[in-house]
């Protein structure tokens, strides 16, 4: 079997090539993202493999189908970049539902600790032999209230970490987990009562810009926001205004709503044209990482193994829980 592999990075090759050789799968690696212009690169392949910022819209789906491709392999959990409605009945869409919930939950906590204990500032200062503690005062996590939006595997891992710090945890999820230890509250109450809010939910029409000017107004002054899920959960302009007004005490972002042409690439020699992102990065109380929360050895191995297994199952006519369909995703 041949697979057109888009948006390839060196760590993708390292994890997928050995599995491909062992399972008689030939990966054709392309650094380009999947778009209408690059879709023809998949001609002659049996499947297409994409990541979070590949654009699988209706036009791309039609191009792939015209070339005889019948399966789309997502090497990620999210599927908001795929037009599932248009793919229905044309392409089988298979995903990796949970490559490492620990990786993402731990990264969320790493961002939080870095922010509130000024680790990023201390690192830069001490490299210049500046050992002053001026403007380095943080705060304890113990006793603080953290709101967790989304209590799937990642959200629950983050909750367990927070409990280890002695934090009070409030939860919101439209589909609550069957766990009596979790304290669920309405979303507006979570926003109102939390000192820290961490997002671990998918991007849907309902969650798009769930953090906006109106919802920010209901939050505590000095609230800390963490987003390791999808960038468009947060209205970036509203966040910027909230930081400038000091309503938001800190923002810890591993994702950004307009990241697709910026993240995963070295832009150090270029002028960043996204003024909002540039201003956010310039803020002393904002930490931005480049969608790297998933990036651990364990997660990369799981992504590769699950993606290859999805393809082999498809070839054998076996479709399981990893299939994403329009009807199920609504």
Write out the residue ranges for each language-model feature.
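Glycine-rich nucleotide-phosphate-binding loops and adjacent flexible coil segments
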Residues: 226
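Phosphate-binding beta-alpha-beta segment of Rossmann-like dinucleotide-binding domains, i.e.
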Residues: 89-145, 157-160
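Structural alpha-helical scaffold elements that stabilize or flank donor/cofactor-binding regions
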Residues: 40-41, 189-190, 215, 279-280
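An N-terminal-biased, well-structured beta-alpha scaffold segment characteristic
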Residues: 2-94, 212
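Rossmann-like dinucleotide-binding domain for NAD(H)/NADP(H)
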Residues: 222, 231-330
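Short acidic/histidine-rich motifs immediately flanking catalytic phosphotransfer sites
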Residues: 42-47, 67-69, 192-197, 220-223
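Short glycine-/small-residue-rich Rossmann-like dinucleotide-binding loops
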Residues: 52-53, 195, 201-203, 229-230, ...
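Rossmann-like dinucleotide/phosphate-binding beta-alpha-beta segment
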Residues: 134-221
């Amino acid at each position: 079997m041949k697979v057109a592999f888009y948006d390839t990075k060196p760590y993708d090759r390292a994890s997928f090539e050995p599995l491909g050789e062992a399972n008689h799968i030939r990966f054709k690696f392309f650094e380009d993202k999947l778009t209408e212009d690059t879709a023809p690169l998949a001609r002659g392949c049996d499947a297409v493999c994409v990541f979070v910022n590949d654009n699988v819209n209706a036009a791309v789906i039609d191009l792939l189908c015209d070339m005889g491709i019948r399966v789309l392999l997502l090497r990620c959990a999210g599927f908001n970049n795929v037009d599932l409605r248009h793919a229905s009945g044309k392409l089988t869409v298979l995903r990796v539902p949970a490559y490492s919930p620990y990786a993402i939950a731990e990264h969320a906590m790493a961002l939080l600790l870095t922010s509130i204990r000024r680790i990023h500032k201390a690192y830069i200062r001490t490299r210049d032999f500046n050992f002053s503690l001026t403007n380095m005062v943080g705060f304890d996590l113990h006793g603080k209230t953290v709101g967790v939006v989304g209590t799937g595997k990642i959200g629950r891992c983050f909750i367990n970490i927070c409990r280890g710090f002695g934090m009070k945890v409030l939860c919101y999820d439209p589909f609550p987990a069957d766990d009596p230890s979790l304290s669920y509250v309405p979303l507006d109450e979570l926003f109102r009562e939390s000192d820290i809010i961490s997002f671990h939910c998918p991007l849907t029409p309902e969650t798009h810009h769930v953090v906006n000017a109106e919802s920010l107004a209901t939050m505590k002054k000095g609230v800390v926001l963490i987003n390791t899920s999808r960038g468009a959960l947060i209205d970036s302009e509203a966040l910027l205004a909230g930081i400038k007004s000091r309503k938001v005490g800190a923002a810890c972002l591993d994702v950004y709503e307009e990241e697709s042409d910026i993240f995963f690439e070295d832009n150090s020699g270029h002028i960043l044209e996204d003024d909002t992102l540039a201003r956010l990065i310039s803020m002393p109380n904002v930490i931005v990482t480049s969608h790297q929360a998933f990036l651990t050895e364990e997660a990369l191995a799981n992504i590769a193994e699950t993606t290859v297994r999805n393809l082999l199952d498809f070839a054998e006519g076996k479709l399981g829980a990893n299939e994403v369909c329009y009807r199920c995703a609504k």
